Structures are given as C-alpha cells and as structure tokens.
Amino acid sequence: MNKTLNGLYKKRITELVQTISSLRAKSRIFVMAEVLSFAVSIGFVVLFTVLDDASWTLGVALCVLFLYFYIRNLDTKNDRKIADASALKLVYEKEVAYQTGDYTKFDAGERYLQPTHPFTFDLDVFGQGSLFQRINRTISSGGSDYLAESLSGKWESLPTAELLKHIEQRVEAIGELAGNEPFLSQFKAQGAEKPIDTAAVKEAFGSIHALQIPSYFGNPTFRILIYANLVGFYLSIFLSIGNFVPAFLPLWWGIFNFFLATFCTHKYIKLVNEAISKLKDQVRGYVNMASLIEKQSFTAAHLCELKANLSGAMASFGQLERILQKIDNRSNEIGIVLFNCFGLLDITIVRHFLRWQRTYEPITDQWIGASSVFDALVSMATFRLNEDEAQEATVIDSSGVSYKARSIYHPFLGEKAVRNNFDIQNHEYYIITGANMAGKSTFLRTLGVNYILAMNGLPVFAEEMRVSVFRLFTNMRTTDDLTHGISYFNAELLRLKQLIASLAPNVPSIIILDEILKGTNSLDKLNGSRLFLEYISERNVTGVIATHDLELSKLEDENPQRFHNYSFEIELGTDVTYTYKIGRGVARNQNATFLLKQILI
C-alpha cells in the first residue's frame, strides 16, 4: 500500500463530501426560486386577460420569464457540479479500495480472455484479479480495447527500432501524467458512473454522417430571413408594451413562428433528434475529456501528438453538446411551444446540425482514436502512480534474447513477495525443479508479467531489469474441451503444435513451460519432454521450463552450454518450510508423500 497516496485519496473524499452537501443546499434554493418565478410570470399573463389596458403586464411577465430561465440555467449548472463532484468522489473511493487490495470495483476484462492466446491466458492478464483489472481505469470502451491490445502483445507488430522509440515515448508520457494526480482523477471522473461506449459513438456518428438535410438550411439568405423574423417579433413585443401596435400582434406572431418552425423541420427534426440522441449519454464524456486535454499543457512528445490529433475536437463536441442542450429544451410540449415561439428552436437545431455535419464529418474517427489512446495512457499512469515501489525497466536493442533481473517479484504478491535474481541468455534453456507449492509456477509468471509491463513502458516489479525484445509464448494452464471432443492430453499436444507454428527463424523467442505433457504417465512424459526440448533447442528459441521430473535435469550433463539447472528448494522437518528462493542445481526434497502422510495420520 502507498500510505501517502492513500491518505491523499481519503482527504479528497472528505473535501468532496462537504462540497456536495453545500451544492445540494443551493439546489433546493434554486428549485424554490424556479417555481416562484414561473408562477409569478403566469400570474401576470392572467392579469393581462382580466384587466383593461394592461399590456404592461406582458412586459413584466416576459421579464420574470427570463428570470426563470436564468435561474433554471444556474440550477442546471449546479446539478452538473454535483454530478461532477460525486463522480470524482467515486474515483477516489475506488482508488482507496485498490490500495487495500480490493480490485473488484474495476473492470476485469473477461471479454478479452482467449485460452489460445500465446501468453495472456497463462499469465492472468485478463479476468478476475488480473493484471488488466489492476491497471484498467479506462472511461471508454475504445480505451479499454486499446489497453487490452497493448497488454496482449501489440508491440510484436512493430520493428524493434520503432518499438524502442515507442516505449521511450510512452515511458515519458506515463511519467508526466503520473506526476499530475488531479488531472488523472478529473479525467477518470468523466466515466466513473457510466463508461463511454465507443462502438455506439462510432455507430451514432455513422448515422449522423448518413443523414441528408436540405442545403437551404445552410443558405445565408435563409439565415438572414430567420434573424429578421426574430428581430421583428421581439420588436413587436416592445412596441406593444408602449401601445404603438396592437397587443395581440406579438401573440399571433409567436403562434406563426411555432407553425413556421414545425412546417420547415417536421421531416428532419425527428431524424436529427434520433441520430444525436444516440450520442446523448456518450458525447458529454467526450466533451469533458477533450476539454480537459485541451486545457492541459504537456511536454511529452506522445502527449503533444495526441493533443494535436484532438485539435478541433473540443469545438466539435462542444457544438454537439449545445445541440443536445437545445434538444433537451424541447423535451416536453411546453418547451417545444415556448422555444419555437420565441426562438424558432427546431429550425436552429437543424441549421446547427447541418453546419456541424459539413465541418467535422471527415475527422471524427481520428478524434475517437486519439481519445482511446489517451484514455489507456491515463490508466497506465495511474498504475505507475499507485505502484511507487516499481521501477522503470531498460529495454535494449539486441538480435537475441537477453533478460537480466535483480530482486524481481510478482506484482500480485505485494509486500509478501520473495524477490529473486535471474539471468536468461540467448538460445539457452533453464530447467527449474522443485516440490509442489515451492514457487515454480509463480516464478514463471513473474518473468512473463514483468516482460509485458516492460514492453508497454510500465514500471516493473524489480530493483533492476534489463531486457531485449522477443516473442513470448507460454504453456502453463492447459484445459480440456469435452464439448469439442478434446481431451487434456490432446489439448497439450495442440498447444505445443501452436507453439512450434508461432516460431520464426529470424525472430528471437522465449518459451515458458510449466510441466510438459502433464496428461500422460511419468516415463512417457519424461521421454516426450526430452524429445520436445531437443527438437526446440535447434530453433531460435530460449526456454524456461518448470518440471517435477528430476531426470530431465540430466540434459545439463549432456549439453551444459545449452541447458542449466535451477531449483526452488524446501526444508523438511516437523513441517515444510518454503523459501521461494531460486538457486542453481537440482531440487533435493519433494513434499507430496510428506504432506499426504500428514493428512492420513
């Protein structure tokens, strides 16, 4: 646990509770003021109908109505402040839970589980309690997908030189973001209640782009006529107050405006409403996201590039937000009548929509892509901020495999982890023996998970780690599939076949195997394991293999330049003592019979 950071999170929660309480008190005052001002406005309209020569009451009613709209606007802004503060409070509450080891409040990414993936299934990258769940703070499905792709080996598609530059830029970007906790929390708060559905946004944008609006709505002459109409309407109101024109002129003019707006837009307003309303719950998150990024100054090259790719997004999403607000204003019959009478609202909505469509249609995909990458980087930066004991890895350019780690440990174990030193050289094989529960499988996963972190520019759980770029393949968690008639042993063979097919002569690879051929008898397993390792050792492959077969360790005697024995030793006395420390040589003690005797006694 990062005690300093945990204290900061709890302090923020206390402050936000007080802020929310104050804002809710204001909200109650605004509601009462709205009811009162609207009632007064209606009262003056009633007076106009019952008094003689009382056109002045319409002017007062109009002024009070404007006051009502002003108070309503303040109330809306106050409600948004309450929602923002509540979302930020939820962000800090989740981070406090993370600090105490409760990861259930974060998405586990179970939809990304792939048993046939080269390494993610074996290394617990996705699923409950996974690496993804510990890192993921994304507020959009696009950001979540990008993060999942990154942890799944996205780096393997890049040439080494380009990848090294990419890692360097990402380390710089993550470091800068991690140093700005308020920005990270504000960013995460935009999707705290409900994540942005990027696929739905893309689909909605597709519908918007496909919508055909008559060009005359964008004609300058049409716009001038609309403005002239409204100027004349409001002029008639003031003239009627001074008894220069009949009092009923503005009333009939307002009715005319209502029917004019309805006639001009009845074919299109519904289509625009349906298309934009699909974005209603999503676009506000993008507006806030783009606003935060636009206001923030960055020095990291990767962040500056993403910000540049979002250029214009704030204006675009802001215009959509304003269109949505106008649609909200016509969400009931009273709103439709009032806003069309006084402002030709429906015509304004269609005109603004057409202008947005013409201006921003070609580049929305670029904005969504940049937002998704930035979203994933915020998650990575939060991970770096929370894990203050983790260190930056050094990724080197090498034609072969190189993996040197000092005091490396598994990130899931926290303070109770036992740290180990381990070096892996190109085209060499490391046979690890040891008793059950001695730490072999955990150590294999330690190597794999920290490599994934290093390739993504994330801090690793070691005092020092120096690693080259290579392809990773694991075989640790084979499962049968009776639905498709695949037995456990057959599944193992298919996995090994997949491993062999993944190898490329010009691409260095590491294979991490936990018990080759577990689904057969001991002698057959030993012979098969030897056959496989002798075959694979002729390829451009480096391997780390955990096994209970002590006989397999004799490969070092036969080829000491290629095979090396390591072990996790235990101590047997009145009980079993596990050191979880790796050392040279073959394991001497086993514990299966010892533990079974304890059960049977």
Question: What positions do the PLM features span?
Answer:
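Alpha-helical coupling/stalk and coiled-coil linker elements that connect catalytic or binding modules
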Residues: 1-435, 443-471, 494-495
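ATPase nucleotide-binding head domains, primarily ABC-like/P-loop NTPase cores
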Residues: 245, 380-383, 387-601
